[in-house]
């Protein structure tokens, strides 16, 4: 899938949709997840509808859903687009 034309909002909405599906698969209500993660119910509802949330609140939700490992894995493996990037990293 090529995301070159996606906006930040498009990506945020997709993340919200994925998190909502995981929450539902684990049979956790919005109110339960909000309480367990110390994120307000209103914030969680808004996130699931719009994708808008602070990074800290997003991380709290992922921690409660046992997804923090996936967050920690972001950007850990370098993706090079050309040889100059490889050379520059070695400097």
Model-derived features with residue positions:
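A detector for short, charged/polar N-terminal pre-domain segments
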Residues: 1-14
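Short, charged recognition helix plus adjacent turn
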Residues: 3, 72-91
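Short basic helix-loop element that most often maps to the first helix and adjoining turn
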Residues: 17-33, 91
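Helix-turn-helix DNA-binding elements, focusing on the entry/boundary residues of the two helices
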Residues: 19, 30, 41, 55-58
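Short alpha-helical DNA-recognition segment
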Residues: 27-45
